[in-house]
């Protein structure tokens, strides 16, 4: 078991944030793995895996670099730096940190990831490993993440809001629940980070950050370049309901009944969500979502309750009945049943 010792001040200052680089690295790890965690990820792999494999087939040094850097229990540190969590850190700025890695550091990190196995001779003296890694991540970003970034960002923001709401209502135990395998709050200033055996780390004075990603990937990272204060980060997968891009479409009958925006909100409220989460997931404005919620609540289709500092909305039994009715489809058509009669039948004149 590996754990971090975290002081009360470090934990109190911990926060959730977004990182385009973390999202792109998670996409790279998914392409490298080549298997899908859910149907939406399968469709994404079908669209991008052939081009990714063709790219590496034409570039053997980079293909070997990826195989050495992304190991089952350890990533090469230079490839997964702790994100800053700063709102103004865009993808090019984050990528520059990888590109600027000294070549000797990159080779040492690869050797560490190999856990005692020798670094392949083809990589042992290369000075372009950071540039190759950065170029590959840039390709993954431009080809597979950037075209879908607005939707991904809304999903990530919704996850951050959900975790923050849990933090407000149940503390860090609730906020960390189910975040990644092996991670849980042990108490006594200890955060278990993995079920694997790793030396304990002292995080006194460090910045503790949590970054969601939409692929089903997770890892840990921390600063090793001597910066002050150092950052330690947990990258974790969004909850499945938020991360899967293939949510069932809003039924046309529900759209005809309620209008498109209102129907989309009702469909999302099978599980409790806040107004801000709904804004993030639907892309609608705050005012529009607020009006839809008021109408649905007045109609008895949704109810609200307070959870800590957040107000959460969820479908009522009446709302569930409406959704079931429009998603079940029409009853099978057939000839009308004969009308039952009592006594003698009559014939019209």
Model features per residue range: what roles?
Residues 211, 216-349:
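Extended mid-to-C-terminal alpha-helical interaction segments
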Residues 175, 198-203, 221-226:
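A general structural signal for short secondary-structure junctions and capping/turn motifs
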Residues 17, 192-194, 216, 258:
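Generic, ordered loop/turn and secondary-structure boundary motif
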Residues 185, 202-204, 213-215:
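A short catalytic or substrate-binding loop motif that flags glycine-/basic-rich loops and adjacent residues
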């Amino acid at each position: 078991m590996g754990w971090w010792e975290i002081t009360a001040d470090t934990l109190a200052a911990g926060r959730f944030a977004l990182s385009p680089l973390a999202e792109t690295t998670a996409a790279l790890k998914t392409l490298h793995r080549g298997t899908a965690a859910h149907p939406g990820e399968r469709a994404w792999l079908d669209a991008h895996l052939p081009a990714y494999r063709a790219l590496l087939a034409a570039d053997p040094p980079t293909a070997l670099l990826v195989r050495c850097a992304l190991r089952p229990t350890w990533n090469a540190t230079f490839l997964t730096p702790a994100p800053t969590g700063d709102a103004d850190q865009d993808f090019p700025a984050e990528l520059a940190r990888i590109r600027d890695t000294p070549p000797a550091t990159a080779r040492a990190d690869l050797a560490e990831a190999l856990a005692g196995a020798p670094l392949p001779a083809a990589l042992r003296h290369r000075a372009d490993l950071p540039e190759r890694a950065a170029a590959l991540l840039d390709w993954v970003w431009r080809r597979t993440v950037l075209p879908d970034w607005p939707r991904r960002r809304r999903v990530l923001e919704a996850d951050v809001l959900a975790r923050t709401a849990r933090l407000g209502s149940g503390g860090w135990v609730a906020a960390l629940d189910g975040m990644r395998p092996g991670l849980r709050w042990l108490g006594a200033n200890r955060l278990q980070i993995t079920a694997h055996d790793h030396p304990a780390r002292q995080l006194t004075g460090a910045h503790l950050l949590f970054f969601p990603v939409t692929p089903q990937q997770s890892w840990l990272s921390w600063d090793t370049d001597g910066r002050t204060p150092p950052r330690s980060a947990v990258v974790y997968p969004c909850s499945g309901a938020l991360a899967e891009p293939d949510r069932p479409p809003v039924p046309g009958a529900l759209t005809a009944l309620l209008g498109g925006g209102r129907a989309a909100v009702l469909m999302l409220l099978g599980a409790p969500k806040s107004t801000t989460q709904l804004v993030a997931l639907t892309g609608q404005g705050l005012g529009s979502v607020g009006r839809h919620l008021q109408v649905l609540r007045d109609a008895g289709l949704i109810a609200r309750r307070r959870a800590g500092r957040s107000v959460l909305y969820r479908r009522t039994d009446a709302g569930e009945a409406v959704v079931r009715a429009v998603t079940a489809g029409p009853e099978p058509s057939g000839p009308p049943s004969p009308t039952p009669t009592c006594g003698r039948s009559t014939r019209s004149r």
